């Protein structure tokens, strides 16, 4: 059976796939999301988000929805790198934001938001085949009532590290697998072992802080979520083995004894669960050799996998989703300039490379041996230096990569500062609708010059002493496409170039070209470039 054409099919209803769906639906595009699981999974995975993605959630009104607070996000004053503290108190424009939330709850909330926006998520429907065409793809699906085919213009693979979409698209996944075994479980810890600030005091070892701890015989991880449920994990290096037999709590106890040198008196957690109890044999660090194959795109773990140390996964994957989402929507809606979709892989690939670099570095610094111990002492000294801490904050937050947007202004290519205008409006609130914003701080001159794009770009006039610019053009993903400190004739020309580069030609030019020859927005852009 073949169904009616749908503009976009998304394979995978995890955080990344659902975020793409929400971005499309905000722009009036209704995707179909396919998920092989019959319902959202309660399996414990990530425990929160860090970095730029927290601010992007704020730009959609989701941060407030997720936290139940009207307050904007605040940066963390400390983070970790391979278990070593990175003090961030003195970092200017600190980009390290954090939102602690279990991944199952995140998926439920994003699914709820997607349904509100009109997204159809088909739980229990698995993508099994793809036949590519010049204008899209035919997607084979296996569902509860049998098999069927969806015709689509675009296909997004958000189906994890073993991505079916990636394999069917013929996209290679090169990388490295390390010889480590990680074991993780939710447990109950005796009250007398609970240390200050969320740490644990292990008899015979002493206090160990919250998070990753490197010891002579491996790594020990501790995180307390609630009184009757803590997460305990171990990392052992150069240990061969397989991942065939189910993980047991006794296996974790044995591993903890090898790492700590003492028994760890933990018991199963109370409550219905589900509770984490898993083993990860080998740590994969891999990146797809390309994020796009024709009309097929990869986001999140489908495009890259890496160590979870430092928590970069959702920051990387959900930013992929927001970057791709608005560009796909612009293309489906007919106003995307030529080459807009090509900027998705060109912008996001290098960000993935940076995450793999620092996650592999953290894993290496967690390894055994006196040489690594000496190297960690050196790193600990360096991390106390303000300039090093600032560099690490931007690396871990993902704000060290600047997109090439065709402008050399210091703000261009970076996430927009969340300033508050004199009338109380925050820049993040202006982006709740997922549309581009032209912020006019010139008294009206900037906005007047861009009236031809008012059907696609929200014009916002205001004043603030917190920005020394007369205007900024902000993409839907929150990145600055153009900014100017003054607004002379050359600045107006550069604004028009930026508007056309990211949001197509003006309404008048598009209408005239279509009357003359029925051209698409991309064709109009090519003729007027």
Task: Please annotate each region the language model reported.
Residues 123-137:
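A conserved short coil-to-beta-strand element within the FAD-binding core of flavoproteins
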């Amino acid at each position: 059976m073949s169904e009616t054409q749908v503009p976009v099919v998304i394979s995978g209803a995890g955080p990344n796939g659902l975020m793409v769906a929400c971005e499309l639906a905000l722009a009036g595009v209704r995707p179909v999301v396919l998920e092989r699981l019959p319902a959202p999974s309660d399996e414990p995975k990530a425990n929160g988000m860090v970095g730029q993605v927290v601010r992007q959630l704020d730009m959609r009104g989701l941060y407030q929805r997720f936290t139940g607070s009207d307050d904007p996000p605040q940066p963390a004053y400390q983070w970790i790198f391979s278990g070593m503290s990175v003090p961030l108190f003195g970092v200017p424009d600190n980009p390290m934001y954090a939102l602690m939330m279990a991944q199952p709850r995140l998926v439920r909330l994003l699914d709820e938001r997607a349904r509100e926006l009109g997204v159809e998520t088909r739980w229990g429907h698995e993508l099994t085949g793809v036949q590519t065409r010049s204008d899209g793809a035919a997607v084979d699906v296996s569902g509860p009532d049998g098999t069927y085919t969806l015709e689509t213009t675009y296909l997004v693979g958000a189906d994890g590290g073993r991505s079916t979409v990636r394999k069917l698209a013929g996209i290679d996944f090169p990388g490295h697998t390390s010889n480590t075994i990680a074991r993780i479980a939710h447990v109950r810890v005796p009250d007398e072992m609970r240390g200050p600030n969320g740490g644990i005091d292990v008899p015979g070892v002493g206090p160990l802080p919250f998070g990753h701890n490197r010891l002579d015989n491996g790594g020990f991880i501790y995180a307390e979520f609630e009184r009757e449920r803590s997460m305990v994990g171990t990392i052992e290096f150069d240990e061969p083995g397989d991942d065939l037999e189910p993980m047991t709590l006794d296996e974790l106890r044995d591993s903890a004894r090898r790492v700590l040198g003492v028994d760890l008196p933990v018991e199963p957690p109370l409550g219905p669960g589900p509770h984490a109890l898993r083993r990860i044999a080998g740590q994969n660090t891999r990146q797809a050799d390309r994020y796009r194959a024709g009309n097929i795109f990869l986001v999140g773990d489908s495009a890259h996998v890496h160590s979870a140390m430092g928590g970069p996964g959702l920051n990387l994957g959900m930013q992929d989703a927001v970057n791709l989402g608005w560009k796909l929507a612009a293309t489906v809606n007919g106003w995307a300039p030529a080459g807009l979709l090509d900027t998705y892989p060109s912008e996001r690939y290098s960000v993935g490379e940076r995450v793999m670099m620092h996650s592999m570095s953290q894993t290496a610094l967690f390894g055994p041996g006196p040489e690594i111990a000496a190297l960690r002492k050196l790193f600990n000294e360096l991390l106390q230096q303000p300039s090093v801490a600032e560099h690490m904050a931007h690396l871990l937050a993902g704000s060290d990569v600047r997109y090439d947007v065709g402008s050399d202004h210091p703000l261009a290519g970076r996430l927009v500062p969340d300033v508050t205008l004199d009338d109380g409006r925050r820049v993040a609130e202006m982006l709740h609708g997922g549309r581009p914003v032209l912020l006019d701080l010139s008294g009206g001159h900037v906005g007047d010059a861009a009236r031809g794009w008012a059907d696609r770009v929200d014009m916002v006039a205001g004043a603030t002493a917190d920005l020394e610019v007369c205007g900024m053009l902000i993409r839907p993903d929150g990145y600055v496409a153009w900014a100017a400190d003054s607004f002379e004739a050359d600045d107006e020309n550069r604004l028009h170039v930026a508007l056309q580069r990211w949001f197509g030609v003006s309404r008048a030019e598009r209408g005239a070209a279509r009357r003359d020859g029925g051209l698409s927005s991309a064709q109009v852009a090519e003729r007027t470039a």
